């Protein structure tokens, strides 16, 4: 009884000093169990993430080799958030964002774009936007391009050991609290580097030290695994995403989809692939059929048929969403990015 009174006195003192809500019970009325999400606009990836999209109030890392679709994925998330009336910002440290491509993917003219000179400036802008809860989604493209001011002002060839990692570590310590309170999704796009002298295991690593690996609630590895051809012309990429880390659902799910040049992620190709996995679309040889109706010979013809018949496409999507659990199991059995099966 004395311990209970002591606890109540301690809680009361904490609330007087730091404000109501500074300490709460796990099962208290103030706690919200449901995680709010924003869809990635990729049906398979929403299923692979386990919660239906990327979580609000969390830090997300998207990394992969060059031209693998990292910025395209981030722009799709921005487009979805804007469609629901949200405000989004894009901190373009690489100075490489193509506004016309962003519009094609569905980004609206209200998207805030910043092209900072130094890494400190970029992260200060991010912190200023996140702290008051002014934005719903903030993308930093990319961590590798966040050049510390000391490096910018120094001579070419100067050694700046650990400066970049120190900058990221400090920024994430500041950001993580305000990201959670403001329910902002902060997406860091990152590049891959090779570790020298690694004889066994994966020599690849991401830039900016280890801090982002710890602070990120979701880490997604994105890679180009093949080309999509129309006769001899390459018209898109076959892309694979692996959920490397997930604090909100089981990780290591893998999903494949198509990115078409000038168009973005192909929804129809995904409906066919996931439809086959969920046993909604039947495949017999090269033919695809739905409810005994043949929809095309070959994947590209089936995609075109669904484009011409949006009602059937919507019906297939509804059936896939109902079979999300079945698809989730199938995604866990997809081969890893290096060809080995993913451990469940």
UniProtKB/Swiss-Prot annotation:
Protein's UniProt keywords contain DNA repair: yes
Entry's Gene Ontology molecular function annotations: ATP binding; ATP hydrolysis activity; ATP-dependent DNA damage sensor activity; damaged DNA binding; single-stranded DNA binding
Keywords in alphabetical order: ATP-binding, Cytoplasm, DNA damage, DNA recombination, DNA repair, DNA-binding, Nucleotide-binding, SOS response
GO BP terms: DNA recombination; DNA repair; SOS response
Single GO cellular component term: cytosol
Cellular location(s): Cytoplasm
Residues at which ATP binds: 64-71
Organism domain of life: Bacteria
Protein family membership: Belongs to the RecA family.
Task performed by this protein: Can catalyze the hydrolysis of ATP in the presence of single-stranded DNA, the ATP-dependent uptake of single-stranded DNA by duplex DNA, and the ATP-dependent hybridization of homologous single-stranded DNAs. It interacts with LexA causing its activation and leading to its autocatalytic cleavage.
Protein name: Protein RecA
Gene name of the encoded protein: recA
């Amino acid at each position: 009884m004395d311990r209970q009174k002591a606890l109540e006195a301690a809680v009361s003192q904490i609330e007087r000093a730091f404000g109501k809500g500074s300490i709460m019970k796990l099962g208290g009325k103030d706690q919200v169990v449901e995680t709010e999400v924003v869809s990635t606009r990729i049906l398979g990836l929403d299923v692979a993430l386990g919660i239906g999209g990327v979580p609000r109030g969390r830090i997300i890392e998207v990394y992969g080799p060059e031209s693998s679709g990292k910025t395209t994925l981030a722009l799709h998330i921005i487009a979805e958030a804007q469609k629901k009336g949200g405000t989004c910002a894009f901190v373009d440290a690489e100075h490489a964002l193509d506004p016309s491509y962003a519009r094609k993917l569905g980004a609206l003219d209200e998207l805030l774009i910043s092209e900072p000179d130094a890494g400190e400036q970029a992260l200060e802008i991010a912190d200023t936007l996140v702290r008051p809860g002014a934005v719903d989604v903030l993308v930093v493209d990319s961590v590798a391009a966040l050049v510390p001011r000391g490096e910018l002002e120094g001579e070419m060839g100067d050694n700046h050991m650990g400066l970049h990692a120190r900058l990221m570590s400090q920024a994430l310590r500041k950001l993580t609290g305000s990201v959670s309170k403001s329910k902002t999704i902060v997406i860091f796009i990152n590049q891959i580097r090779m570790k020298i002298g690694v004889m066994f295991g994966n020599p690849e690593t991401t830039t900016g030290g280890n801090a982002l690996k710890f602070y990120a609630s979701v880490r997604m590895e994105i890679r180009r695994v093949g080309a999509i051809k129309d006769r001899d012309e390459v018209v898109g990429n076959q892309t694979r995403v692996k959920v490397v880390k997930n604090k909100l659902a089981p990780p290591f799910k893998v999903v494949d989809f198509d990115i078409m040049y000038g168009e973005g992620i192909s929804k129809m190709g995904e409906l066919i692939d996931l439809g086959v996995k969920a046993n909604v679309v039947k495949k017999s040889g090269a033919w695809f059929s739905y409810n005994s109706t043949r929809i095309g010979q070959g994947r590209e013809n089936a995609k075109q048929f669904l484009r011409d018949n949006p009602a059937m496409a919507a019906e297939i999507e509804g059936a896939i969403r109902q079979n999300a659990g079945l698809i989730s199991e199938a995604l866990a059995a997809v081969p890893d990015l290096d060809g080995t099966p993913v451990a469940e």
